[in-house]
Structures are given as C-alpha cells and as structure tokens.
C-alpha cells in the first residue's frame, strides 16, 4: 500500500499529534518493515497539500490534526483529504473537535451519562470571591485545548482564592482562552489506548504514576518531557472493569474512529471519571504512552500496533 505520513513542523501548534519528527520516522520505518511504501511529508501550506493529492497515495496517515497556513487559516487535514477522496487514518473533523476542545469532550461524554469530573470554565475577574465559585476547593486549573501537559504544574492545584486568581491570570496571559477548572480528583491516574479492529475494540489500560513533588503527584509538561512518570499494569480487577467500561463507552459516545486514548482519574472514594480524549496520540517509540501501554499491558509490539492503527483507513480505501 502506498502511504504518506502527513505532519507539520510548526512549533506554534498547541497540539502536537504523534509528537516530534522522530515519531513520524518511527511510524515510517514500521510501515516499511511491514512491506508498505511509505514517506513522511511535511505540509506547511496549501501547495504542499495539493502535492500530496497529485501523488495519489492509497492512504494518508495524519500525524497532526491541522495545518496553519500563511494567512493564519486552519486547514483541517481530515476535511481536506475527505474532500479529495483520499482515505485517512483516525477520526473525522466532527469528532476531532472533542479532542481539540476538552470542554466539548466533557459535555458530550457527560450527556451520555458516563461518569465525568465536575468542572467549569473561567476568565480573569469573572469571579470576585471564593463563595461565587461553582465548585469548592481544592481545584485543578489548566488550558482548555492544550496537549502534553502544557500549562500544568504544581501551581495548577489550588487550595484558596488567591492561588486560584494567580493561576487563572497566568494561564490566560499565555493561552488567551477560557481556563478549564476541574474538581481535584486525588486518586490514581489512568490512560486507556483503544484500537478499533474488525468491528471490535481492543482497549489497553495502564496506570500512570508521576513522581511526587511537594508531596503531590502532578502529571504536567515537566514530567512528560523528562519521562519521569512510571507506567504500570492495573492488577485490581474491580478497578480494571470500571476503567474499561468508562473508556469504551467514551470512545463510542465521542464517535471515535480507528484509535484514540482516553484519560481517566479516580477520586478518593475510588470512583473513576472520564477526563479527556486524545485522538492523535503520541507515537514516539520508547516514550509515548500509546505504544508503551500496548507493550506493557498487552505485549503488542510497535510494528503490530502501527499495522492495527492503519487497517481501518486501508479498508476504507478499497
């Protein structure tokens, strides 16, 4: 099969997709090993994308969701290739919005009666006193559409109004968008890699254990960059069942196609809640959660994983 992996090297993208260029190279090498023809194409403008259409690949593997062209316009790759009748990996534009906008994702999942952590959104000076806040402290603050733990650090967990105001201002200054404020869930943290294969879901859950800093565990950009978190299989059968049920229901509720990663957190009573969906998960060999989870919890090797991830697009191209 003739395949092009489409990426973008724009550092301004808040959402990193498969990850650095090396991740796309990892995917390419994997495709070559399983006897496909594969190249990585960096698309920075419309003429780059038109070039892909002219080459007529059988499928395109979308390593990012969109390309920002010179005019500042967003070209959503799923829409672009759909319009040109080229089969692409992953979800449609309609579904990808639930990843790009974490609030939309939470609303959709919650509307389907899937357990979801309580939250609200805010901008600076929207609330003048602690009593006005929709939720009680402690609270957890983060950007509403950023990936890879960006904007998340030890200051994200706030216990009083002065800390809350400071973090809201800091995040708003950097991201210029409403801030997502969540009830703080102090229990364990999980992520579930899900692959659609032959009409069934292969769901692979793992626990993520960030290192303790100032007595708390926070999975922020520093931890993710340093790879200092531990990934572990889940051995408690009750927890495992709960996580799998939430992850699979969320996958279906959001209309995810081919693959996706569902993040789940536990509260102190042991109840699990949907946190967010990642529909273009990192694929850097050796460090990204998606391939690591597959290896740790299901012994699915990298090449086998890539093969499973692209099969839906191959089927649709025929």
Cite the ranges covered by each PLM segment.
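Flexible, glycine/charged-enriched surface loops at secondary-structure junctions
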Residues: 180-182, 257-261
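A short, flexible beta-alpha/helix-coil linker loop
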Residues: 9-13, 146-148, 228
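Active-site nucleotide/adenylate-binding loops and adjacent lid/helix of ATP-dependent enzymes
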Residues: 2-7, 25, 46, 53-54, ...
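Short, basic/aromatic recognition patches
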Residues: 248-252
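ATP-binding N-terminal substructure of ATP-dependent carboxylate-amine bond-forming enzymes
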Residues: 1-88, 94, 99, 123-130, ...
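Phosphate-binding site of ATP-dependent enzymes
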Residues: 161-245, 266-273
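C-terminal active-site "lid" helix and adjoining low-complexity regulatory extension at the edge
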Residues: 257, 266-318
């Amino acid at each position: 099969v003739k395949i092009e992996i489409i990426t973008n090297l724009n550092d301004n993208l808040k959402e990193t997709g498969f990850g650095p260029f090396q991740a796309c190279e990892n995917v390419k090498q994997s495709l070559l090993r399983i006897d496909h023809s594969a190249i990585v194409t960096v698309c920075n403008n419309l003429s780059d994308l038109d070039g892909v259409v002219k080459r007529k690949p059988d499928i395109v593997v979308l390593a990012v969701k969109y390309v920002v062209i010179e005019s500042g316009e967003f070209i959503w790759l799923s829409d672009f290739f759909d319009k040109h009748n080229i089969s692409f990996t992953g979800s449609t534009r309609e579904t990808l919005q639930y990843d790009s906008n974490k609030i939309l994702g939470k609303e959709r999942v919650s509307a389907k009666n899937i357990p979801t952590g309580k939250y609200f959104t805010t901008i600076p000076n929207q609330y003048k006193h602690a009593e006005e806040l929709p939720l009680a402290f402690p609270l957890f603050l983060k950007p509403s559409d950023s990936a890879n733990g960006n904007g998340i650090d030890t200051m994200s967990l706030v216990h009083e109004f002065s800390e809350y105001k400071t973090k809201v201002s800091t995040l708003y200054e950097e991201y210029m968008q409403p801030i997502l404020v969540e009830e703080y869930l102090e229990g364990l943290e999980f992520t579930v890699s899900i692959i659609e294969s032959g009409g069934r879901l292969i769901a692979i859950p793992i626990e993520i254990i960030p290192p303790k800093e100032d007595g708390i565990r926070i999975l922020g950009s520093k931890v993710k960059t340093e790879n200092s978190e531990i990934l572990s299989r889940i051995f408690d059968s009750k927890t495992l069942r709960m996580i799998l049920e939430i992850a699979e229901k969320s996958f279906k509720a959001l209309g995810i196609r081919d693959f996706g990663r569902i993040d789940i957190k536990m509260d102190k009573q042991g109840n699990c809640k949907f946190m967010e969906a990642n529909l273009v998960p990192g694929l850097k060999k050796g460090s990204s959660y998606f391939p690591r989870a597959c290896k740790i919890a299901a012994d699915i090797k990298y090449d086998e994983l890539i093969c499973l991830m692209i099969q839906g697009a191959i089927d649709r191209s025929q």
